[in-house]
């Protein structure tokens, strides 16, 4: 008996909210094929929209020739994702105001209609006030930077919880955190800055909606729009951070800048730990997860690999066909930059450059790379 877990994108609407995860438990072992991917995409659409429609365009897949599903979790990948750290992160985040474990919902009627044993989705529409799993990442990395700064300045070890309530605002109030975003990561950083007591400057590109910009401004962030794509906004944020002595809280990484993005993505593993507990011993055979720069996909891959070892599921990474930097990188066996308009309905996935940290994990651990 096979099973499938799908992690949906951060902007798929479900009755006005955001759907984050979909799990499918199948009656039979699923061989990976274009047809299988098409079926799973239909499951995702059903879970998100509550009605069926066709996926327009050709689905292209590439199998990773470097994959060894029998391998245990490599020691050298722990510097990018380490499941043993998740409980300490979870203990901190549980103390934040408004924390609650988000539900894994059983879509029994849809499963029955499709003759599937079980379908679940991880409903992140209830994650803090941001209604996104991204709340676990940018805000956590922001808190970590402030925690380290205050510990140095006071010459004593403080917890992230100690930052709440404005106790150290006199030390942190003039610090500026910055990032580039398509929306939800920037909201997470802005929320973290407001929660833990520092300033925030967010860079957005030309395709980010005014509503998303307003949402970040409502959290106290200064928002700067540039005339370029997401990757251009990443470069601009990094350049201005040097010029104005700001700290970049990015969810993408590159050689020489890996530690803060690791904090961002390790925050996401809190959601994955919840999923493992909620599955109550069941293990999916396949996991479908969307990707932009690859941060979430890498955490899904690495965390489940570390927890389930050689019993881990196959990880299928899904990208827009016009922004398939991970698939092209997998074909070549090294990071590849995809240029052009990167046009896609899923603006949050319109990324042309792979995150350095994410690539280290996905190059070894992902099974297939699919574009839609």
Regions found by a protein language model. Name each.
Residues 47-372:
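PLP-dependent amino-acid enzyme catalytic core
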């Amino acid at each position: 008996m096979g099973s499938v877990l799908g992690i949906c994108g951060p902007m798929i609407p479900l009755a006005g909210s955001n759907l984050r995860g979909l799990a499918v438990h199948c009656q039979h072992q699923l061989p990976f094929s274009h047809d299988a991917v098409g079926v799973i995409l239909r499951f995702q659409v059903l879970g998100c929209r509550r009605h069926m429609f066709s996926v327009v365009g050709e689905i292209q897949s590439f199998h990773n020739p470097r994959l060894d599903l029998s391998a245990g979790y490599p020691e050298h990948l722990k510097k990018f994702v380490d499941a043993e750290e998740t409980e300490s992160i979870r203990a901190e985040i549980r103390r934040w105001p408004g924390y609650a474990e988000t539900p894994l919902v059983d879509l029994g009627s849809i499963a029955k209609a499709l003759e599937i044993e079980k379908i679940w989705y991880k409903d992140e529409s209830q994650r803090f006030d941001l209604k996104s799993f991204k709340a676990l990442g940018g805000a956590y990395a922001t808190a970590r930077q402030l925690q380290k700064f205050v510990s140095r300045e006071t010459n004593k070890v403080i917890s992230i919880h100690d930052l709440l309530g404005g106790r150290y605002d006199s030390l942190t109030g003039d610090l500026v955190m910055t990032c580039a975003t398509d929306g939800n990561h920037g909201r997470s950083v802005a929320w973290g800055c407001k929660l833990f007591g520092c300033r925030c400057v967010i860079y957005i590109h030309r395709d980010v909606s005014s509503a998303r910009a307003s949402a970040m401004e409502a959290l106290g962030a200064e928002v700067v729009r540039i005339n370029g794509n997401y990757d251009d906004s990443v470069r601009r944020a990094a350049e201005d951070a040097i010029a104005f002595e700001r700290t970049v809280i990015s969810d993408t990484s590159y050689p020489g800048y890996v530690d803060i993005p690791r904090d961002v993505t390790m925050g996401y593993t809190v959601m994955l730990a919840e999923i493992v507990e909620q599955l109550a011993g069941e293990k999916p055979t396949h996991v479908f997860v969307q990707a932009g720069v690859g941060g979430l996909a890498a955490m899904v891959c690495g965390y489940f690999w570390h927890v389930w070892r050689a019993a881990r599921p196959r990880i299928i990474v899904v990208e827009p066909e016009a922004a398939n930097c991970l698939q092209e990188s997998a074909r070549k066996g090294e990071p590849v930059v995809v240029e052009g308009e990167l046009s896609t309905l899923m603006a949050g996935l319109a990324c042309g450059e792979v995150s350095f940290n994410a690539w280290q994990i996905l190059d070894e651990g992902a099974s297939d790379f699919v574009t839609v």
